Amino acid sequence: MNQRTVFSMLDRAAVQYANDPYLSTKNDQGWSRTSFSEAKTKSRRLAAAFIELGLKIQDKVSILSEAKTDWIIAEFAALYAGGISVPLSIKLLPEEVPFRVNHSDASLFIISENTLEKVISHWDKYENKNLKLILLDLPSEKIKNQCKKHGFDEKNLIYIEDLYKVGEAKMQKNDENLSEIEKNTKEDQVVTISYTSGTTGNPKGIMLTHLNYFSNSHAAVATFQIQEKISTLLILPTDHSFAHTVGIYTALVKGLSLHFVDARGGGVNALKNIPANLIEAESNFLLTVPALTSNFIQKFKDGIKAKGSFIEGIFNRGIEAAIHRNGDGFSKPGAVTQFRTIFNYLIAEKLIFKNLRLIFGPKIEFFVGGGALLDIKQQQFYKAIGIPVYQGYGLTEATPIISTNTPFNHKMGTSGKVLEGIKCKICDENGNTLATGVKGEIVIKGDNVMKGYYKNDTATAETIKNGWLHTGDLGFLDEDDFLVVVGREKALLISEDGEKYSPEEIEEAIINSSSCIDQIMIYNDHQKFTSALITLNKKAVEDIIKRKDITSFKELNQHLKEEMFLFSKQLEFKDKFPGKWIPSNFQVIKDPFSEDNQLINSTLKMVRHRITERYQDRLDLMYAKKSQEVALKENIKVLEELVSLD
């Protein structure tokens, strides 16, 4: 039996889809395409150069760059040389990068012109003094100036083009060694260490193996029934676990063609280039996250509104009609509804919807959604205009796909059906399996479950029990076996683009620096900003009222807001937490979280999902229109009940 490894996937693709385009990156001459066979050849050549640089078996290679062909080649090269890839998020702050590189014991660090300054600005924080920096771009004036600005010797940069030449020259010497490494690779060997969530000081490194990627890629293909040789523009960064598996590795199984957004000049340029790149790539499908689909919807609506009330009316009536016609996707309304809505739908389809689809290219058929929960209204909207979003669910620890909707099995408001080969159950707090329709923790088992957390046996044991991965997500299986994900059990914030972060350290910092705030639960469930629920120390608040001579509840509310940021003035917390995770709005809760109201458990920890459920209306206030005004009004009501200004 052939080993189920990344190598076997690339070997097969290099033969079956030899001359078909695999990776396409834009340059000054247009789109530069690399075929499947060329990708394998270039990867082995670069691997030979890595070995010449001193890379040894199980050595780590960190990658911090925007998506491009050489990013993918570099990961394959690391594997061919016997190493392990450590893909890093391009969204990391400069001060967040060193921990991940140091913790993973990286020997090589692959970066781009766009990420160079992020790295060399904190060069003294990297522990490996022999760490080699490899640049995926050609020498430029920008690179020279950045090195000069930070006192970094440009001679210490190694350019990938030079390494390709070294690899070609040393290929004969290293060819047998590379073949031996590939031959001896086991299914349970680690391919990547992906750092996810956690506070600045303690993110966890998720170890994913050859078998993890092999099984999840093949299961996704089998479940989705993906066609061969279709194309996509990969808008998501390649460090994103969803893009990593569904993009890089699923492409090997079915000969998919990947185009990368033209990010020359940085992130702002990348955003500007997406519309043109969408047309040029002629994508059949796109991988997306709710933040992206939400932005597209807003742009559509703004564009339609600008055309006047007549067109806007046709559009709105067409959307409403299509939503009624589509039902939930799984079961459609009857003939009466279809007949009643057909006129408004057809008018909007002919005049508007077909043109909206062309924005994504002439061949677009569907989106595959992941990374965060997708609001059902977004699903209804895209289905209405003829580009359904087939929402899935997963997490990096599961490589990441656990379930997905497909063109053949689709129900809006759900995350689809569990992939072939994965066992899924819903459990209560004591590990008992719950019945259909009953909410509990989503627990899974399969070849896609991670090997564990790097250098963190305790966290691994807490997450994987008897082979079952405890996701920390709450959900249930409905009567048709569709998985419905309803929220988090674990204490993780999730931004609108699916990025995750642990709130505990921020919460502790706020409580420890404020005399008034007794308890705080920071909240972000796929939103643009972070908010908080707080309970107050009544005596401390009364003291503040007297000491500060506070004469209005609006003034008191402002003081509480200032109390929330007191921690940032302390040296130990200066620039420690990324701004997006610090609450920008809050709601005062009258009653403390306690064991009596079941919002605190027996170990005195907050039961976050219960707090969220109980105060969902207060949380929603902070994300409503005119949220600051509405939240202030509600806070004043509570403060009036809690304390007196007399």
Which residues does each predicted region cover?
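Conserved pre-ATP/AMP-binding loop-to-beta segment of ANL
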Residues: 18-21, 157-195, 202, 225-231
